[in-house]
Amino acid sequence: MKEEIVKRALNDFMQYGFKTFTMDDLVSKMGISKKTLYEHFPSKNDLVEAVLDYALDMSCKNVDAFVQGDGSVIENVYRNQEKVKEIFNINSDRPIWELQKYYSKTYERMEIEFAKSDARFIDKLLEKGWKEGLFREDINVNFYKTFYSSVQRLRSVANTFPEREFPFWDTIYTLIEYFFRILVNEKGMKELEHVLQLKNNKLI
């Protein structure tokens, strides 16, 4: 039951927001009693912490798999991003803004873990991209890691990319494209354009 609560809470927090979605809402949606919920999670803060642990386990600890698949490293990243989109059911940065505002310690812990995850992801990405002959050899790795992580954090700051002007997933995929454009050589550019065409045709 505890894991079921965490999974459902993650889905609803991502959809409605960490502050907006209440414990009463969760009880109602799951059809369980308040007693059952509070036996497992005495406070909403406890639930938010458990949800973060679960989300980090799903994303950060499996970061190596993000570049894996049957296609090129570029295609694999796009395909795996689609899987993330389906799993987390998130369509706005609002949940992250609420987490930062109302659960600041949890947010800070998330930022630390994501920074570590970003660094591991870049290592795996570059390793595979170089092996496939798609990336430039003269990349300043430390600078790129800092740049990548900083832009990811900047994206989550409210009003940096106003969602009325820059829809959430359009922003995500535009950033992915630009991150790759910095890395690719001539061969990699052709592959990136091929993958973008697949995505535009909804084949990814």
Enumerate the language-model features and the residues they cover.
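Helix-turn-helix
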Residues: 4, 12-46, 50
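Hydrophobic recognition helices of helix-based DNA-binding modules
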Residues: 51, 55, 59, 63, ...
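Hydrophobic alpha-helical connector segments
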Residues: 50, 64-91, 145
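C-terminal peripheral helix-coil segments that are non-catalytic and often amphipathic
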Residues: 124-128, 165-204
